[in-house]
Amino acid sequence: MAKEATRIRRRERKNIVSGVAHVNASFNNTMITITDAQGNTISWSSAGAMGFKGSRKSTPYAAQVAAEDAGRKAAEHGMRTLEVEVSGPGSGRESALRALQAAGFTVTSIRDVTPIPHNGCRPRKRRRV
């Protein structure tokens, strides 16, 4: 039995002009997902996916590189305007936003959607360094 030649599926070019950039900046990593208005993912990137490991993933520079990568992929699909939703306490929040603006996107709105508990679960214990 001969193996069938695996067909490489070419990613079709969607023509989406505006979308939403979700920036999730945790203490350990920064993830950027660019979606259309319905929430379907167009492109994504993270500091870890860009080759940063360990504590370097949480740096603002790593977030900037990841945002540039996600923006470049989204621009290939014709995206030009973005709404930005920033979530999390990490250090890559502002640098990812600046990188998206520098990549040529028109940022129409910036929203902070960090979940804040109204005295919900007990937080983890304090670090003593």
From Swiss-Prot:
It comes from the Bacteria. InterPro entries: Ribosomal_uS11, Ribosomal_uS11_bac-type, Ribosomal_uS11_CS, Ribosomal_uS11_sf. One of its GO terms (cellular component) is ribonucleoprotein complex. The keyword RNA-binding applies. GO terms for biological process: translation. Keywords: Ribonucleoprotein, Ribosomal protein, RNA-binding, rRNA-binding. Pfam families: Ribosomal_S11. One of its GO terms (molecular function) is rRNA binding. Part of the 30S ribosomal subunit. Interacts with proteins S7 and S18. Binds to IF-3. Belongs to the universal ribosomal protein uS11 family. PANTHER family: 40S RIBOSOMAL PROTEIN S14/30S RIBOSOMAL PROTEIN S11. Located on the platform of the 30S subunit, it bridges several disparate RNA helices of the 16S rRNA. Forms part of the Shine-Dalgarno cleft in the 70S ribosome. NCBIfam families: PRK05309.1, uS11_bact. This is Small ribosomal subunit protein uS11. The gene is rpsK.
